[in-house]
C-alpha cells in the first residue's frame, strides 16, 4: 500500500480528527488533510489530489 497516498479526514469533532490522523501516522500515512464538515470536504475534494477519505457519517449540515 502506498504510504504517500493523500488522505482527507472529515469530522465535525476536532478531537476525533486528531485521533484518526495520529492513528494514520502510526501506520505510516503522514500525507493527510482535515475538513470540519461536509461542505469543506466537498470543496477540497473538487480541487482534487485525494486518494482516500475517512469520514464521519453523521455530521451537522
Walk through the language-model features, giving the residues of each.
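Active-site residues of response regulator receiver
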Residues: 56
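Non-catalytic signal-transmission and effector/linker regions of two-component phosphorelay proteins
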Residues: 1-6
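Helix N-cap/capping motif at the beta->alpha junctions
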Residues: 34-43
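Two-component/phosphorelay signaling modules centered on CheY-like receiver
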Residues: 14-33
Amino acid at each position: 500500500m502506498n504510504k504517500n497516498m493523500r488522505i482527507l479526514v472529515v469530522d465535525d469533532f476536532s478531537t476525533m480528527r486528531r485521533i484518526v490522523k495520529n492513528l494514520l501516522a502510526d501506520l505510516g500515512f503522514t500525507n493527510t488533510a482535515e475538513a470540519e464538515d461536509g461542505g469543506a470536504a466537498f470543496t477540497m475534494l473538487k480541487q482534487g489530489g485525494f486518494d482516500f477519505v475517512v469520514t464521519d457519517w453523521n455530521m451537522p449540515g
